[in-house]
Amino acid sequence: MNNNLQGDAIAAAIDVLNEERVIAYPTEAVFGVGCDPDSETAVMRLLELKQRPVDKGLILIAANYEQLKPYIDDTMLTDAQRETIFSRWPGPVTFVFPAPATTPRWLTGRFDSLAVRVTDHPLVVALCQAYGKPLVSTSANLSGLPPCRTVDEVRAQFGAAFPVVLGETGGRLNPSEIRDALTGELFRQG
């Protein structure tokens, strides 16, 4: 397999995801690493790679809101809250939603909620559409190192054989803003 995922990049990335492996890809601000949210094996590989404890919880990134619905509980949202969220999506704003009991703990960590985002990065939209579901998404960097902004930086941190979807980031300087879906409270400035 070509580990740089050249040629039919989306199909090659999906093959890697279906093998319960982790891929790197450009997002709005930095490269992300991601995997199948329904595979505990894949998520544990991602957490080990990042040296991140499972109790911190993760973010899902999706092509559209429908892809996120199996993982979140939006029944408590008012029409005004929905309008606020949908006015920011697609885009670089992550919202923390209540999570139903069916959402795996390997995604939510110690929380009863899950952070989710509908991306506006064309390559990630195409990847999630082709895969048919969201991806776990976290910044592509090893513990203690800055997030990768280029393919070369990904290769330097993760190795030349690490599967990377080639492309450019969206040019944003900061990672996504994170807000509570119910209260609007700002958790991280974007």
Curated annotation (Swiss-Prot):
GO terms for biological process: regulation of translational fidelity; tRNA threonylcarbamoyladenosine modification. Belongs to the SUA5 family. TsaC subfamily. Pfam families: Sua5_yciO_yrdC. Its EC number is 2.7.7.87. GO terms for molecular function: ATP binding; double-stranded RNA binding; L-threonylcarbamoyladenylate synthase; tRNA binding. The gene is tsaC. It catalyses: L-threonine + hydrogencarbonate + ATP = L-threonylcarbamoyladenylate + diphosphate + H2O. Residues 7-190 form the YrdC-like domain. Its main location: cytoplasm. This is Threonylcarbamoyl-AMP synthase. It is found in: Cytoplasm. Keywords: ATP-binding, Cytoplasm, Nucleotide-binding, Nucleotidyltransferase, Transferase, tRNA processing. It is an enzyme of class 2 (transferase).
